[in-house]
Structures are given as structure tokens and as C-alpha cells.
UniProtKB/Swiss-Prot annotation:
Molecular function per GO: 2-C-methyl-D-erythritol 2,4-cyclodiphosphate synthase activity; metal ion binding
Taxonomic source organism: Vibrio parahaemolyticus serotype O3:K6 (strain RIMD 2210633)
Record note on cofactor: Binds 1 divalent metal cation per subunit.
Name of the molecule in the record: 2-C-methyl-D-erythritol 2,4-cyclodiphosphate synthase
Entry annotated with the keyword Oxidoreductase: no
Top-rank taxon: Bacteria
Pathway the protein acts in: Isoprenoid biosynthesis; isopentenyl diphosphate biosynthesis via DXP pathway; isopentenyl diphosphate from 1-deoxy-D-xylulose 5-phosphate: step 4/6
């Protein structure tokens, strides 16, 4: 059996940098406001995995009303969810992540993001794609108010 999952996340800028995205700390004058570390890429990816196994969303498993998750490392959340994916008998086929941000520039960090995600999902880096785009200065991302990310995953039954 093959399953697909889709995830989406948004965080607004605020406070001190760096911005953590795809498991990588990117120098920037502001950080992202969040209960956890605010890693929009990993949050979208985590939601995609949860969606693929019909297990709800990240907020259900790691609620922002629970102080246990305050400042949580999103790489640990992703690994926890991938453990659940494997427990249900699935393995990752591939993951594709799109980051929508006017700033900071993502291109210099994409390879490191792919490597971190591949490590966390126990897969070859060739199964992970991360790309970034601006919104041509349109909308909240274009005004540099925040960052949005979408992710899709393909899972195969083992």
C-alpha cells in the first residue's frame, strides 16, 4: 500500500534570531515566534507524516498548551512521529518540502537541511528535496512578516 501526506505550517517573525528551518539554524535578525523552536519546515513535514498514517496533526500530539513541548527541538518531534510511522509498518519513499520566505535567504542552507532531514527520517538524502521560493514580495511572507512551508511525503507499506 502507498500513502501520501501533506503538511503546512506558518510562523511569524519576532524576538531574537536565528531562524531554525529544516533543522538548521540560519542567522537572521529575528527568530520565529512559536511554542517550540518554530521550525516551520519540520512542522509541515511532521504534519505530512501524521496525515499519511491518518494520525491527526502536530498540535494533537505536541499541543502548545502543554509546557512539556515549550522550546522543543522539532527534530526530536519529527523523529518521534517517524517512529510511529515505522510502528504502523510504513517506510518513507520520499519527502518534498517547499519553503515560502522573502527572507532570510534559504539557498545556502538547503543542502544542510536535506542532510538533517535524511538523518532524522533514516533515509538516503536522494529521497529528500527541500526548495525555497519567494512570493515576489506579495502577502505576509513577501512583507517579511513570517515564513510558510508545505511538505508532502510518500510512504510505502513494508
Amino acid at each position: 500500500m502507498i500513502r501520501i501526506g501533506h503538511g503546512f505550517d506558518v510562523h511569524k517573525f519576532g524576538g531574537e534570531g536565528p531562524v531554525i528551518i529544516g533543522g538548521v539554524a540560519i542567522p537572521y535578525e529575528q527568530g520565529l515566534i512559536a511554542h517550540s523552536d518554530g521550525d516551520v519546515a519540520l512542522h509541515a513535514l511532521t504534519d505530512a507524516l501524521l496525515g499519511a498514517i491518518a494520525a491527526g496533526d502536530i498540535g494533537r500530539h505536541f499541543p502548545d498548551t502543554d509546557d512539556k513541548w515549550k522550546g522543543a527541538n522539532s527534530r526530536e518531534l519529527l523523529k518521534d512521529v517517524y517512529r510511529r510511522v515505522k510502528e504502523q509498518g510504513y517506510r518513507l519513499g520520499n519527502a518534498d518540502v517547499t519553503i515560502m520566505a522573502q527572507a532570510p535567504k534559504m539557498a545556502p542552507h538547503i543542502d544542510a537541511m536535506c542532510a538533517a532531514i535524511a538523518e532524522d527520517l533514516e533515509t538516503d538524502i536522494s529521497n529528500i528535496n527541500v526548495k525555497a521560493t519567494t512570493t515576489e514580495r506579495l502577502g505576509f511572507t513577501g512583507r517579511k512578516e513570517g515564513i510558510a512551508t508545505e511538505a508532502v511525503v510518500l510512504l510505502f507499506k513494508q
